Amino acid sequence: TLTRAFVRAANRPEMAVLDTRKTTPGWRALEKAAVVCGGGVNHRMGLYDAVMIKDNHLALWGGGSIAKAVQTARMRFPDLKIEVEVDTLDQLREVLMAQPDWVLLDNMEPERLRQAVEMCRGGCRTEASGGITLSTIEAVAATGVDAVSVGALTHSAVAIDLGLDVGI
């Protein structure tokens, strides 16, 4: 399966290969079950299992800094994990002061990912995301990230070509 190919290509068993919420309407449970069968991990089933703060949320929020957004989310949803998307090391520095549970490192090259992982060591967990393919996942995994998320596991997986010939 596509998920199994990503898990093998990562060549780092302790790192989670995560799916995303990008699923076919009405097929989410089956597509996510297929990811697990292939050795991947379901990241989130819906918007209800974690707080993910992304760039669009911050643009619309208008409440100040990224760190303030994390603090507000933690006060409003104390039982949920908080994950923040960053795409620069400067954003990461600011976010780390608010102590999120996870940071999503979006569209970062392996060297930048390595630096980000080092900055997060002993603090929050790290997830690499954005444009990760079968040919790039091993280099991304080698940076030491805790997880890699791949939307293609659910939105672009190709069905197996099955056929059945019946002879009478």
Where are these regions (language model features)?
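Short acidic, glycine/proline-enriched helix-loop-strand junctions
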Residues: 122-125, 167-168
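Short secondary-structure boundary segments
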Residues: 107, 130, 152-153
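Acidic/glycine-rich phosphate/pyrophosphate-binding loops and surrounding catalytic core
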Residues: 1-87, 91-98, 102, 111-119, ...
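Short, charged, intrinsically disordered terminal tails
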Residues: 152-168
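Cys/His-rich Zn2+-binding cysteine-cluster or related metal-binding knuckle/ribbon modules and their
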Residues: 134
